[in-house]
Amino acid sequence: MRINPTTSTSGPGVSALEKKNLGRIAQIIGPVLDVAFPPGKMPNIYNALVVKGRDTAGQEINVTCEVQQLLGNNRVRAVAMSATDGLTRGMEVIDTGAPLSVPVGGATLGRIFNVLGEPVDDLGPVDTRATSPIHRSAPAFIQLDTKLSIFETGIKVVDLLAPYRRGGKIGLFGGAGVGKTVLIMELINNIAKAHGGVSVFGGVGERTREGNDLYMEMKESGVINEENIAESKVALVYGQMNEPPGARMRVGLTALTMAEYFRDVNEQDVLLFIDNIFRFVQAGSEVSALLGRMPSAVGYQPTLSTEMGSLQERITSTKEGSITSIQAVYVPADDLTDPAPATTFAHLDATTVLSRGLAAKGIYPAVDPLDSTSTMLQPQIVGEEHYETAQRVKQTLQRYKELQDIIAILGLDELSEEDRLTVARARKIERFLSQPFFVAEVFTGSPGKYVGLAETIRGFKLILSGELDSLPEQAFYLVGNIDEATAKATNLEMENNLKK
């Protein structure tokens, strides 16, 4: 969905600079430019430079770059944020005197931006009275909110077994077609309804098709309100796979800057989605090589930990509000020891693993209850009742997993009475972990359900206690709280009696 950016004043304000600091392109190597400036007029690191002019065919050129290195001899090396086609040596370069700034605030909701904060959705210009630079330091210790609190999502399997921390970072692992997008959209919907919060989606190195699909699905499910765009619950920032590495490396910071404004100025709870955090590292690796740095382990940039840290440390809770981040993590060749995912893991508070096996069974959300983890699942944080229930649910499911081979070979009848009971309860638990989503209503026809944490715990305690052993397992499939399951069981019984 790469549409030419709508003409907007959101780029660095060139006219206001009266062109006071001009340089000229000295060398072009792919997306990297060397620019010569007059002595004593060197731009700072991270300053935005703008190249304006015409190419040999007479087409207008407008390329924004970011200063990365000061080379000496009055030269700087900058990385381009868009294609460098048509640039020639000797072209005039304007130093904007400040880092890249992007529009922030309510005007960004329901819109799609590129790395420069320019709208790319053909819906006209964006109000740019409020802008913010993409390079900022992380909040000071004194501003941080150190209280550990659960971020309730209303999704049973997440809240019970791998709860999210308010202001924490969650890794989302899953292959293609297991429901990542639907889970992301449901979280965006729930934070808006339950917490009055907003979301920012950063597509980092995304496939253009996937970005387009997400946008269309968001419009279909009402997350983006086409009639009244200001009522939308999400802002989208895309730096697709076809963009130069500079854009892919910085698009995460553009999304984060928009999220920080909602947290610090509007004092809201914000969800920040980054899909995919691995592409951020990959783009950094490309830029590092282009800048001539010596590669580190597995060819990654030597500054890998620093780059990751500078992004992740800005994602946190402050006294004003919180940014809770959900990051899709691609694991190259399924090697968890690869430096990119290994560096990411150090920052995560919880992992949500989506399982193809559960998706194949039709259990959605297909979150793997045994593989998903959270540092919040401790009795002193979530309370004894929640912790005990979660552990017993996991034990039951683990035992069922161990017995599956025996069942496959010998059948259920060969199991002991106790094991048969465990299997029956585990199958009920497995089905009760499924849930109808609000954003899937348009596809499934069944109304979505938000289940509070207390209701979730009560439901699983009842299943584990054996009080519901007499109910059929299909009564627990795709329902909200436990009362709906018992009502569904009664309906099923009545239907069966009528058939007889």
Curated annotation (Swiss-Prot):
NCBIfam families: atpD. Transmembrane segments: none annotated. It is found in: Plastid, Chloroplast thylakoid membrane. This is ATP synthase subunit beta, chloroplastic. SUPFAM superfamilies: C-terminal domain of alpha and beta subunits of F1 ATP synthase, N-terminal domain of alpha and beta subunits of F1 ATP synthase, P-loop containing nucleoside triphosphate hydrolases. GO terms for molecular function: ATP binding; ATP hydrolysis activity; proton-transporting ATP synthase activity, rotational mechanism. PROSITE patterns: ATPASE_ALPHA_BETA. It comes from the Eukaryota. It catalyses: ATP + H2O + 4 H(+)(in) = ADP + phosphate + 5 H(+)(out). Keywords: ATP synthesis, ATP-binding, CF(1), Chloroplast, Hydrogen ion transport, Ion transport, Membrane, Nucleotide-binding, Plastid, Thylakoid, Translocase, Transport. It is a peripheral membrane protein. Belongs to the ATPase alpha/beta chains family. Pfam families: ATP-synt_ab, ATP-synt_ab_N, ATP-synt_VA_C. Its EC number is 7.1.2.2. It comes from Manihot esculenta. InterPro entries: AAA+_ATPase, ATP-synt_VA_C, ATP_synth_F1_bsu, ATPase_a/bsu_AS, ATPase_alpha/beta_chains, ATPase_F1/V1/A1_a/bsu_N, ATPase_F1/V1/A1_a/bsu_N_sf, ATPase_F1/V1/A1_a/bsu_nucl-bd. GO terms for cellular component: chloroplast thylakoid membrane; proton-transporting ATP synthase complex. Produces ATP from ADP in the presence of a proton gradient across the membrane. The catalytic sites are hosted primarily by the beta subunits. The keyword Ribosomal protein does not apply.
